[in-house]
């Protein structure tokens, strides 16, 4: 028994010791509880400050949340006694909150990608709210700097709310195949899976329809409630961001689908400079293959897909978004915004859409389907603990219909915290997609280049810059004061170094040893090495 399950059992023993006035039993239970306050183990707190339980899978909203709330309670309970946590243990819990959970809560709502299998009614609110109590409990016994950051977390997420967020940046959770991007006005996250990391689970009839939730699900938030309680009305084959089969058949069930549950690919990861970043995955699951990547900037998320193919006769789609309807879904045609009612198939000339606070722009001609409609559903259909009661709601959705095309691709932008006017005027020519195929996905944005090399490739990033990427990986190149700043990541977690040439000059990036990574509590650039190279 490990992780939170072990803590729950030890907590029962602790209560027994208290009732029996047995000091030694209480001490033994306490020691068992705090023994789980560590990182780098197979389950529990990971070295990137995510949390695993039931094998290698992210459990922020379930076991990890229970672990943090319970441990914070013990931290406050034991403070000032002989059972008090030591400095290292307190520091681990504080970092778990500040370097882990702080990233996945936006204005009092937990990210859908963090809920795991527990898709309860208003779960985003309740789970985020429990963190407020955990934060207050951790303050007792914490350093002044940690208390300051905890207070900032509370101000960002709980009443009275700020207009924007003071906590911004970009982080890839390398142990859990998940990326979070935060600006002052919006947040986005991507959840993936690999041959290392399980995407999601079905336990106790929780998450009966969540088969695709780890296939590159992308959520964007401005208020935080954009997806609140949408689950009964979802088309579960069109979870935002995923590429999946178009079918009226029931979504595959985890417990009888064998090897199809796991993504077979190792190439899943992300790179960041702390402010922007690129995330990529090879999807190889259920007979469907795709190369998917996301570029996160201060103003938008650029989504790329290539090599989409399957061994099925079913059509394939890529979901751009599917969220709660708040106002009209608008399409841009001949200089005017027109409302979408029901289902609308756009023409190649109509590639801009807007809804609520978010714009969407397709960067290449695609068969895009826009939906704005009322739907009915039942919570019990995906969470077995609910009564069989029908509820109604309204959703809007956008998806790209690839049909049965072999080697399909896509390019589209998501513009959070935008307006219809800004979406219409957005200058797409400022983004240069250099290549988008199964070998490489490369994009130029200003003086920065984002590159995912799935295999060794030579690419001309600009007229006077040729890069020979000898080791597959995810790279960022940025010109800074006449030098090239390089950020790089190994998505396979198998390389000790990355080799490349810039204009025929050799560059080698060496990663720190994995053992040192976990023991040193290094920040979230652990899989990333940076280097200045003179132009």
Per-segment meaning from a language model:
Residues 407, 512-535:
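Solvent-exposed, conformationally flexible loop/turn segments
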Residues 1-111:
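Aromatic-lined, polymer-binding surfaces characteristic
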Residues 67, 74-497, 502-507:
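Extended polysaccharide-engagement surfaces of secreted carbohydrate-active enzymes
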